[in-house]
């Protein structure tokens, strides 16, 4: 039957043909699988990346597909910018959210702007993600 054959050729997502380059450019977050959702790798862009729970009509930069209701629709923000040396700097802040944003299990204060590095562990609601910084050429 043709059923098995058509399964092999999954339609390619055409909306972002440069996704691989895009991921490298400014890094990404890896959302850890939990009871509320599956593992997801979501690219970051330059500037403010608003991270939160994906839902209809909620236009944010990094929507996480999850049923975790303790995650706000706009929960935290990662700012990505280059310093004078051209090195990417990642800064985390709370959006602010109802349940808070945690970096390595420490809660961020409302005014906190915390510089984070590759491998930083961030928890929003009951969901955890890890920062994957972009590969940087050593100058």
Feature locations, PLM:
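Forkhead-associated
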Residues: 45-128
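Intrinsically disordered, low-complexity acidic Ser/Thr-rich regulatory segments
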Residues: 1-67, 79, 83-89, 133-139
